[in-house]
Amino acid sequence: MKGGKRVQPARPNRINREIRAHEVRLTGVEGEQLGIVSLNEALEKAEEAGVDLVEISPNAEPPVCRIMDYGKFLYEKSKATKEQKKKQKVIQVKEIKFRPGTDDGDYQVKLRNLIRFLEDGDKAKITLRFRGREMAHQQIGIEVLNRVRDDLSELAVVESFPTKIEGRQMIMVLAPKKKQ
């Protein structure tokens, strides 16, 4: 096992004595502007308040610094990013496979699954696979896809409808309708 020094991960913001500017534009704890002051004066004010001096915008002239609790600032920032990730809905494409001879009972089960996918906000990919002599009866396949499209017309919008057969299958993609 190799020994070594543990390196602290670099902070995104410089704090307290890490700030290199001579003068800074200072913002108070409540967000009020305190004007342009020397770095030492800003550090003293932060120390009096019992919190940190954090460099918010290092590229500004002079750099903008704020008096705040840095630990609390990082916590709020991570909480906000987690909240944003939670709100993002990753749209998945769910696939259901049909055959030209799919019986009515199986059709109803597959249709129920499609309805569930669309209500959850996911896209649905309907693959119609032909085997053997079924290739000669492509019209039956198109009828199945039309039936699915008509049954789901209130829930979904057709994104792509097959005009010709691709290999031994036809693919139709449905997207959920936007809710008003």
UniProtKB/Swiss-Prot annotation:
InterPro entries: T_IF-3_C_sf (IPR036788), T_IF-3_N_sf (IPR036787), Translation_initiation_fac3_CS (IPR019813), Translation_initiation_fac_3 (IPR001288), Translation_initiation_fac_3_C (IPR019815), Translation_initiation_fac_3_N (IPR019814). Keywords: Cytoplasm, Initiation factor, Protein biosynthesis. It comes from the Bacteria. The keyword Protein biosynthesis applies. One of its GO terms (biological process) is ribosome disassembly. GO terms for molecular function: ribosome binding; translation initiation factor activity. PROSITE patterns: IF3. Its main location: cytoplasm. GO terms for cellular component: cytosol; membrane. It holds the Pfam family IF3_C. It is found in: Cytoplasm. Monomer. PANTHER family: TRANSLATION INITIATION FACTOR IF-3, TRANSLATION INITIATION FACTOR IF-3, MITOCHONDRIAL. Belongs to the IF-3 family. IF-3 binds to the 30S ribosomal subunit and shifts the equilibrium between 70S ribosomes and their 50S and 30S subunits in favor of the free subunits, thus enhancing the availability of 30S subunits on which protein synthesis initiation begins. This is Translation initiation factor IF-3.
